[in-house]
């Protein structure tokens, strides 16, 4: 803990915030030495910004040993000054990259190193102690050295290690323009491009290759060609390539992979009979994998062979049944076949939240409304049920006690009973009344939490000298969180000071202080504290401009990136809206432009509005299409019906990732209900 010192002159902070660095330097010159760490930091920044990086280092070196918690901020400033002098920033950044360092410090140090590697001499990069780097940075350094040094072998080594990160995509994009590689190497490059979302580049690379002769190489060429065509929406060409892959497959693994991809193409194309045969072929090749079972069971129901599907379940391996069983039961309920759905549900472990949720749907479909309410109460009170709880609430019909007032309560089980029997509005009102009577929560509900008194530490010291952005980005963990009121202040302050993901986390921690309360039961007055208006302001503006439902866009962005403009996924998706490179091309922007948060939000809002126009006012379909693609979702609706019950559609979705995604988006929509 830094020892208490007199607060700095407010004029210093005002000058820092306004970027008047000459004034900062002049004010600092009048202060007694030694300078407190925060003032030493802004003095050094003033020197660096005014073109005196050597002077900045002179200020930082004596201050660093007594910097305490501010050492990370001072090391980062030292690294920037070293870079300005053309020096290697590694000596300043190395301590911040060790595992004990807080994640924000590691991220900031990594970002500084990435910039340094673009400009420092190649010899300097080659001298970086790679073993001291985290694995991801080690790979990025290898790519930087390979690209700048024209070293094909080093770039290929990055691909040989793994293909699902940003370093692999950068290496593959560079290698794609190089010449003289054998076919097997070209295929490895194409694979990395596909995984990284650069589908068109992969397709062009594959199209330039002559058909290989050796069976295993020919299989990989045909399979990757089929995947690229599928991703680009060219289903006839995908089918042709995948048929070639199936014809030359020499192992069960190859037959499984090709059959799964070819079955998806057939199903999307509306050829259910062929798709069923392909799903069965996948199941025969790999009977302990989910995909073959799932597709075969689903299409048997679609083709009117539900009894056969239920019979097959008896031979399903237990780990597979946990996944495909709920999907089959949901598909049967979508077809209004509760008797067979019950048979399937009886074979599924009832501790699964989705199985219990489908049990409520089954009871309602068979007219057992009171039994359904009782089952819903148990589910609603169980935090392990997650976002399935909101889906159950949407299922329940109004009861005789609907909207009747309930006494104030914060008890999760009591709130569950109120919601199931008197409705969501009554449960919200009961919780709101209980919180309003609690001094720890009343000011949170009023949306006016003041700055906590007695707040100290690194983040506070940085804010006192006008470095609020650094306080939020480097020390979000040092913000007050002792009481609900402090958490509400922290959530709003973090976003105002420039750290939206940390603000979202603080708001969600505030929600967690209520225990196992579903998002649907949160009082509207509490929602701005959990999801601050400043956090979603960009979404609100973009959605209104593009004609998209505001809560839908908020829910999607919350799930896609947690409002992080620098987010990058293993699938190559970039930025706050998580578009892949091919989507950027379709939308008329470059991948680099997707890192512009406001631009990306407008593009996302346009996509949501377009999908809503295609699928109508149905959040599940729109969110699923944003995640899995509209062609895929259209094929599901062709099988499940154009207006399926939302809960059943989510549970029946063949893609587990998409099902979870839609549930999370729906939860976010509840949180954004005040907008």
Label the predicted regions.
Residues 7-26, 42, 49, 184-201, ...:
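Alpha-helical segment of the N-proximal tetratricopeptide repeat
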Residues 13, 45, 80, 115, ...:
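Residue-level recognition of tetratricopeptide repeat
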Residues 322, 343, 350-353, 357, ...:
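Catalytic glycan-binding domains that act on GlcNAc-containing polysaccharides
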Residues 28, 60, 93, 156-159, ...:
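Hydrophobic/aromatic packing residues within the alpha-helices of TPR/SEL1-like helical repeat arrays
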Residues 2-10, 33-42, 67-77, 86, ...:
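Generic helix N-cap/helix-start motif at coil->alpha-helix transitions
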């Amino acid at each position: 803990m830094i020892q208490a010192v007199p607060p700095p002159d407010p004029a210093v902070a005002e000058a820092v915030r306004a970027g008047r660095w000459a004034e900062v330097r002049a004010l600092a010159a009048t202060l007694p030495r030694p300078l407190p760490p925060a003032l030493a930091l802004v003095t050094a920044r003033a020197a660096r910004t005014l073109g005196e990086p050597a002077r900045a280092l002179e200020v930082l070196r004596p201050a660093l040993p007594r910097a305490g918690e501010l050492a990370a901020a001072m090391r980062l400033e030292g690294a920037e000054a070293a870079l300005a002098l053309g020096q290697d920033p590694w000596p300043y950044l190395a301590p911040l990259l060790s595992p004990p360092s807080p994640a924000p410090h590691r991220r900031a140090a990594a970002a500084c190193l990435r910039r340094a590697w673009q400009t420092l001499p190649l010899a300097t990069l080659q001298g970086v102690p790679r073993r001291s780097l985290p694995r991801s940075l080690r790979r990025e350094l290898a790519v930087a050295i390979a690209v700048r040094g024209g070293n094909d072998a080093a770039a290929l080594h990055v691909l040989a290690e793994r293909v699902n990160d940003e370093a692999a995509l950068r290496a593959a994009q560079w290698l794609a323009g190089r010449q003289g590689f054998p076919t097997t190497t070209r295929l490895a490059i194409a694979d990395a491009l596909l995984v990284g979302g650069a589908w068109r580049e992969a397709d062009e690379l594959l199209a330039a290759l002559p058909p290989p002769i050796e069976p295993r190489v020919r299989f990989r060429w045909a399979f990757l060609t089929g995947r690229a065509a599928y991703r680009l929406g060219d289903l006839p060409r995908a089918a042709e390539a995948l048929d070639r892959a199936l014809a030359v497959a020499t192992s069960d693994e190859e037959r499984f992979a090709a059959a799964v991809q070819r079955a998806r193409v057939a199903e999307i194309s509306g050829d259910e009979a062929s798709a069923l045969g392909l799903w069965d072929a996948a199941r025969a090749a790999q009977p302990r994998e989910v995909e073959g079972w799932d597709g075969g069971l689903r299409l048997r129901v679609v083709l009117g062979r539900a009894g056969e599907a239920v019979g097959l379940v008896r031979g399903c391996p237990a780990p597979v049944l946990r996944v495909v069983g709920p999907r089959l039961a949901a598909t049967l309920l979508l077809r209004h076949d509760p008797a067979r759905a019950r048979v399937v549900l009886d074979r599924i472990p009832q501790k699964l939240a989705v199985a219990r949720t489908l049990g409520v749907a089954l009871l309602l479909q068979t007219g057992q409304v009171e039994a359904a309410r009782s089952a819903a109460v148990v589910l609603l009170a169980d935090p392990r049920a997650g976002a399935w709880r909101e889906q159950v609430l949407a299922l329940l019909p109004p009861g005789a006690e609907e909207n009747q007032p309930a006494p104030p309560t914060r008890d999760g089980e009591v709130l569950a009973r109120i919601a199931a029997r008197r409705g969501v509005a009554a449960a919200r009102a009961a919780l709101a009344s209980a919180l309003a009577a609690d001094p720890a929560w009343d000011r949170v509900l009023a949306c006016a939490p003041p700055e906590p008194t007695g707040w100290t530490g690194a983040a506070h010291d940085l804010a006192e000298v006008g470095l609020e952005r650094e306080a939020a980005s480097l020390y979000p963990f040092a913000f007050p969180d002792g009481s609900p009121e402090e958490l509400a202040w922290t959530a709003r302050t973090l976003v105002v000071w420039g750290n939206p993901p940390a603000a979202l986390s603080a708001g969600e921690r505030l929600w967690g202080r209520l225990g196992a309360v579903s998002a649907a039961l949160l009082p509207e007055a509490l929602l701005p504290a959990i999801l601050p208006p400043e956090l979603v302001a960009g979404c609100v503006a973009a959605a209104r401009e593009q004609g998209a439902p505001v809560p839908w866009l908020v829910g999607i962005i919350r799930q896609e990136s947690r409002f992080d403009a620098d987010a990058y996924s293993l699938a190559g998706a970039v930025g706050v809206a998580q578009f892949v490179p091919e989507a950027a091309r379709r939308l008329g922007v470059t991948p680099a432009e997707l890192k512009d948060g406001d631009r990306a939000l407008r593009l996302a809002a346009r996509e949501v509005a377009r999908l809503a126009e295609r699928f109508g006012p149905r959040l599940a379909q729109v969110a699923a299409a944003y995640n899995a693609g509209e062609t895929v979702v259209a094929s599901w609706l062709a099988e499940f019906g154009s207006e399926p019950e939302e809960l059943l559609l989510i549970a029946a979705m063949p893609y587990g990732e998409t099902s979870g995604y839609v549930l999370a988006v729906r939860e976010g929509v509840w949180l954004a209900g005040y907008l």
